[in-house]
Amino acid sequence: MASSLLTSPGMIPTTGSAVVVRSVLPFGFSLPSLRLTRPYNKSSLFISCCSPVSEKEATKAIDLKPVVERWPEYIPHRLPDKNYVRVFDTTLRDGEQAPGGALTPPQKLEIARKLAKLRVDVMEVGFPGSSEEEFETVKTIAKTVGNEVDEETGYIPVICAIARSKQRDIEAAWEAVKYAKRPKILIFTSTSDIHMKYKLKKTKEEVIEMATSSIRFAKSLGFIDVQLGCEDGGRSEKEFLCKILGEAIKAGATAVNVADTVGINMPEEYGELVRYLKANTPGIDDIVFSVHCHNDLGVATANTIAGVCAGARQVEVTVNGIGERSGNAPLEEVVMALKCRGAYVMDGVYTRIDTRQIMATSKMVQEYTGLYVQPHKPIVGANCFVHESGVHQDGILKNRSTYEILSPEDVGVVKSQNSGIVLGKLSGRHAVKDRLKELGYELDDEKFNDIFSRFRDLTKQKKRITDADLKALVTTCGDEKLNGANGKESNGYVPVPQISSMV
């Protein structure tokens, strides 16, 4: 799936126009005619689609040339249009809190640069009030990454620091991020009964005063972009959330989030919470509403998407889903869900993430944290674009869209049509014959039948059959009927448990 900004040659849509666009996509994918009604900014739309069509139909589509889109001006409390979803990455703060996932200052700086290439809207890079080293690291990122402007698009990442509702934390945050072109602070406070009673030991009124006074103090220091985070919002009373959010908005907050801190909510439940707060909080439509979900019950991605469907327009995520306990909503899953299905079942929501940077970013985070993803991890796992079943292999060899809804190239994996095929006991004749051809062997039916029979015997002894095994099977078969057995090297895609060896 082409991950590019597209517009019809000679035609620039204007703000508010509705146009029909088509695009040619790899291996049989094509973007169906789609009426797009969200505003344009003298430019084009970041399009993607997961609906397969025939090759014949695909060739009829207009091949649109990629263009570069200027990013709209960043306004803390307002989005460029109602369907735009900001991506707030917290890999370097919440993600680093994953047990065993601590990063060195140079590693945090490198990941921040990688996140900028990914084009996250906001990166939360640390907790300056927690230690001198953390303060200096956040400051370094603000001075460097926070001032690096993409000349073509005008993109500049927002650099965010987190703080408790304490003046010393807020002062430390300001001193650390004030060097960035777009500094931001996230001030959090607990809002659930259990947290207020046992952790804060404060009444609801005291918590509201603590939050609002902290927002006003942050604004007095120079922060223009101030977000209030409701810790344990998923277990908080709805009416109280409406009240504290409303007061925060009056105090000058430009964004608010309601965090499912302990990962207890179900998608329908969390979506309904967001919907209720959007409908009953004074001033909520004048700021950005954000969602922050943890994965204790395995539904962080689903909850985040439910929040977007309910009206949230900022998602807080981490690369590979790393974070406290079972982790956070994974950036790659949320972004690709929005990219793949946003136009079809979510009223056209979209992000500006450069998804081609996803795999490289995932690998870097894995290597630096030592937290490797499981092979079947969606989007970035080693098995994501690999097939062993004979039926699936046959389909993939005919047209990849038969069993893959995403293009590997779209997330930064470069593959050929025949790669992604793993030979084993479930593999069929088509896959084995095709692999032999890639290795340079042109065999008649009799010879291939003999080799395939011995291939089947070999699969009873080995889980996976390598190219060397196939060559040995041919060589020991006698007359090699090669078109030279030319020793042609293969660029096949063979997965291993650690993703660092995958691409």
Curated annotation (Swiss-Prot):
PROSITE patterns: AIPM_HOMOCIT_SYNTH_1 (PS00815), AIPM_HOMOCIT_SYNTH_2 (PS00816), PYR_CT (PS50991). The keyword Metal-binding applies. Signal peptide: none annotated. The N-terminal part of the protein controls substrate specificity. Residues 85-359 form the Pyruvate carboxyltransferase domain. This is Methylthioalkylmalate synthase 1-2, chloroplastic. Its EC number is 2.3.3.17. Keywords: Chloroplast, Manganese, Metal-binding, Plastid, Transferase, Transit peptide. Belongs to the alpha-IPM synthase/homocitrate synthase family. Pathway: Secondary metabolite biosynthesis. Optimum pH is 8. It catalyses: 4-methylsulfanyl-2-oxobutanoate + acetyl-CoA + H2O = 2-(2-methylsulfanyl)ethylmalate + CoA + H(+).
